[in-house]
Amino acid sequence: MVTLRVDEISNIIRERIEQYNREVTIVNTGTVLQVGDGIARIHGLDQVMAGELVEFEEGTVGIALNLESNNVGVVLMGDGLMIQEGSSVKATGRIAQIPVSEAYLGRVINALAKPIDGRGEISASESRLIESPAPGIISRRSVYEPLQTGLIAIDSMIPIGRGQRELIIGDRQTGKTAVATDTILNQKGQNVICLYVAIGQKASSVAQVVTTFQERGAMEYTIVVAETADSPATLQYLAPYTGAALAEYFMYRERHTSIIYDDLSKQAQAYRQMSLLLRRPPGREAYPGDVFYLHSRLLERAAKSSSHLGEGSMTALPIVETQSGDVSAYIPTNVISITDGQIFLSSDLFNAGIRPAINVGISVSRVGSAAQIKAMKQVAGKSKLELAQFAELEAFAQFASDLDKATQNQLARGQRLRELLKQSQSAPLTVEEQILTIYTGANGYLDPLDIGQVKKFLVQLRTHLKTNKPQFQEIISSTKTFTEQAEALLKEAIPEQMELFILQEQT
């Protein structure tokens, strides 16, 4: 018979009593009533806050968006295929935030800041809220530094400044993404961190953009946030805010950032889908009433910080797609009214071979010449007016049979000015090259050439100036002014190259 060792048993009981810790945890829970289409309705969760993250039994996370009297509408940040009716949900007490660090540079991530480029985890010690308040009036200063895009048409006539919000708007297939990606390529060596946010696009298109960046060495200073067309609507809706949070991290560390949202029409559609499924009342074009706030709270985060905050900046270039040039639709008018100007791309110009297909007439920059260096103002100040007059004259000339010599000369000059604004994709020009190009056209040096020869001559002229007159580039980059000395160098170089070019063409 086994003998009971009373002292041993009493010691074990005493130890257990000493180890007993009476802790009570209060968890705010609920039960899934209904799930489907990326939406779940939850009974319970009485203490949940609007925008709070909730966690389902099987691990999916959602955001509580609709707080109704008898249930809570939650949008799922995932497919939610394993969620079952009747399963429990708990409130986390947190709102959506992402890790942020320098290690994100050169990576492709999703809306939850998880890497999707197969290059391992990203280490980050800090985190930022996905939705944080925009800087106030005192925290900002007016825009005064240029953000060079490398595109003559933009930098000379629709200049963009650091901290500005400039909308790129146009029909599909008019080169909106090309303008944005060229701007990123042109930031090489400019100490600007770029973010490219792809919302609801084809995965192949995003891969193409990433490949271009890698080939041109732009990924060193770029972060790509991608939620493709097959992603849940919730993640497409969140992607721009994730990009903005990363850009803000660098902006508040006294750095310059530029962020491209490609495109906000798709984000609005994802938000419309979520809102209709949550049974929120539809408004114009079936969008919910707060779709303006959706974009305004995103774009207001772009700013030029005041000197107290280190003068960092965040420049936003949102893209919006129009249907057959209709700029008066709901989303285009909303975003136009939020931004500091727009670059309008026209399908007619694109099809006529004018690329980038920028309609200079209705494109504006509300920051204006404050975002240009003095040299560019001196050379390109009248370009927009001259082109507008040329377009008017060209329309009139179609009806007139015999034109006087002055009108013919003005038309010829205008055609050459329009020709020099054409540029190949992924071939951005430096400011010095742009100043040289505009000066050559505006002062009639291109008039003796045929229109077909203009591009070839300009390429040769840029090379000639770089090799034989390097002082020109030094003067512009050091003084930021088009001095008499710089003009004298051009007056020498252009006729020299013109003689060589004409001889070359004759042989």
UniProtKB/Swiss-Prot annotation:
SUPFAM superfamilies per the UniProt record, alphabetical: C-terminal domain of alpha and beta subunits of F1 ATP synthase, N-terminal domain of alpha and beta subunits of F1 ATP synthase, P-loop containing nucleoside triphosphate hydrolases
Compartments reported by the entry: Plastid, Chloroplast thylakoid membrane
Keyword Plastid: yes
GO molecular function annotations of the record: ADP binding; ATP binding; proton-transporting ATP synthase activity, rotational mechanism
Residues the record marks as site: Required for activity: S363
Residues annotated as binding ATP: G170, D171, R172, Q173, T174, G175, K176, T177
Keywords per UniProt: ATP synthesis, ATP-binding, CF(1), Chloroplast, Hydrogen ion transport, Ion transport, Membrane, Nucleotide-binding, Plastid, Thylakoid, Translocase, Transport
EC number in record: 7.1.2.2
Membrane topology label: Peripheral membrane protein
Pfam families to which the protein is assigned, alphabetical: ATP-synt_ab (PF00006), ATP-synt_ab_C (PF00306), ATP-synt_ab_N (PF02874)
Name of the top EC class for this enzyme: translocase
InterPro entries according to UniProt: ATP_synth_asu-like_sf, ATP_synth_asu_C, ATP_synth_asu_C_sf, ATP_synth_F1_a_nt-bd_dom, ATP_synth_F1_asu, ATPase_a/bsu_AS, ATPase_F1/V1/A1_a/bsu_N, ATPase_F1/V1/A1_a/bsu_N_sf
Transmembrane feature ranges: none
Primary location class: plastid
Catalytic activity line of the entry: ATP + H2O + 4 H(+)(in) = ADP + phosphate + 5 H(+)(out)
PROSITE patterns named in the record: ATPASE_ALPHA_BETA
Cellular component GO terms held in the UniProt record: chloroplast thylakoid membrane; proton-transporting ATP synthase complex
Function: Produces ATP from ADP in the presence of a proton gradient across the membrane. The alpha chain is a regulatory subunit.
HAMAP family hit by this protein: ATP_synth_alpha_bact
Protein family according to the UniProt entry: Belongs to the ATPase alpha/beta chains family.
Subunit structure comment from the entry: F-type ATPases have 2 components, CF(1) - the catalytic core - and CF(0) - the membrane proton channel. CF(1) has five subunits: alpha(3), beta(3), gamma(1), delta(1), epsilon(1). CF(0) has four main subunits: a, b, b' and c.
Protein name (Swiss-Prot/TrEMBL): ATP synthase subunit alpha, chloroplastic
Organism: Drimys granadensis
Gene designation: atpA
